[in-house]
Amino acid sequence: LYRAEVRLFADGELCDSEVIETGFRKVGYDKDRGVLLNDVPVWLRGYAQRATNEWAAIGIAPEWLKDVDAMLIKESNANHIRFMHVAGSKADVRSFDRHGIVCTQPAGDKERENFGRQWKQRVELMRDVIIAFRNSPSILFWEAGNNSINKEHMAEMRAIKDKLDPSGGRFMGCRTLNTEDVIEESEFVGTMLNRHAARFTAEHGPIMETEYLREEAPRRIWDDFSPPDFDYKTKWGGKGGRKQVGIDFYDMTSEDLALASAKGYGEFFNDRIGGASKKDYYSGCAALCWTDSAQHGR
């Protein structure tokens, strides 16, 4: 990372100054190799995380704990965080800059297409987010929404990026794009649970799985066989509140979670560009989520 001091002069007098921390990297994409960092293919894997990214009992963590967070992420063999719904904090992104963790940064969304003043508000927010974070080398993806938007809106978001971040080497896109005209207008496409992935999309730009392993169980129980639980009952999960055959995401033990994590990651690892399935879809994937707090029940 490098620090540059920017100074503002008026009539020869210094009015203001700011030190900007930034970094340099070359970003590209090859349909047969995936995302390229400094011309080297990089398989992006990691977690989808709420932008609050709080610590259990502490809440919003101090900056040194953000660095602990980043080191733990790296130690888990991950190199990517996708923030969900709204932009991650400056402190988180600064930490990812320091530790080399790729970031997908949204602005804001409504879980669906919106219009009129609501859409203009999202555009204004994306403008502000790009200005605030465009010097952060860890950000490779700007996310225009958590659900599909139309071709005109995608073009509008790309125009903002081209104007305010023309040399950042970043991709502008959206989750659950599934029509060819919008895909052509985007620079990357996000999927959820491997829906809508296709080779023609990967030939256009990166496909990123945005949040597999959407489990929402408390995981208080280690396994089904140790007392006093013996296949514990849940209030809402499964038929009659009992665990069903297969993966019931509302009634997972810690043992179930480990198996589901391996199964989920294996799906996208095999479907990655160059993977064993030969589908050649994915450039990256993110599991939901990296956290030790409630995260809205997740």
Where are these regions (language model features)?
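N-terminal carbohydrate-binding accessory modules
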Residues: 5-73, 94
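Substrate-binding/catalytic cleft of secreted carbohydrate-active enzymes
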Residues: 64-297
